[in-house]
């Protein structure tokens, strides 16, 4: 069954605050094999002009995917998550994510398109400090396989 087009433009409430810790940044950097000292050493980060260690750019996926839960668990959308694959991910950083940041994320359904029997769900995650400072915009495309009517075009 196709996804509900009326969800385009729907904004979900902000996530609970997420405090970015130095150890989480180190763990993520290790997991993606990013050896830059700015992710591990506060002095190296300060020498590079940052107030504390900074996260690798893709660290934002932790916050964006956490926020996506509101969309994918919304039964009214009609999404069967067992048929979903991740199609695309882009980040626009307004500033680096830093240790000590307290961030929240608001997600918006930007688009739903039917292609070749699949629905393409585009979700935008706006990551900000709890004070409202923009930090990152993450845009994800999820492919819901076999949900659209065959032959539908958006």
What are these regions (language model features)?
Residues 1-3, 88, 93-154:
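HotDog/MaoC-like acyl-thioester-processing domains
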Residues 1-88, 149-154:
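Hot-dog-fold acyl-thioester-processing enzymes
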């Amino acid at each position: 069954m196709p996804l509900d087009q009326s969800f385009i433009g729907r904004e979900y409430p902000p996530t609970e605050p997420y405090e970015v810790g130095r150890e989480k940044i180190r763990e993520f950097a290790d997991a993606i094999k990013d050896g830059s000292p700015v992710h591990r050493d506060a002095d190296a980060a300060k020498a590079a002009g940052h107030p504390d260690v900074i996260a690798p750019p893709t660290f934002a996926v932790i916050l964006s995917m956490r926020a996506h839960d509101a969309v994918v668990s919304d039964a009214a959308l009609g999404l069967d998550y067992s048929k979903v694959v991740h199609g695309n991910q882009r980040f626009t950083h307004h500033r680096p994510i830093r240790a000590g940041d307290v961030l929240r994320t608001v997600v918006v359904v930007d688009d739903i398109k039917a292609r070749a029997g699949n629905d393409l769900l585009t979700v935008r995650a706006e990551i900000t400090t709890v004070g409202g400072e923009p930090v990152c915009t993450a845009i994800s495309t999820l492919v819901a396989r076999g949900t659209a009517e065959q032959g539908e075009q958006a």
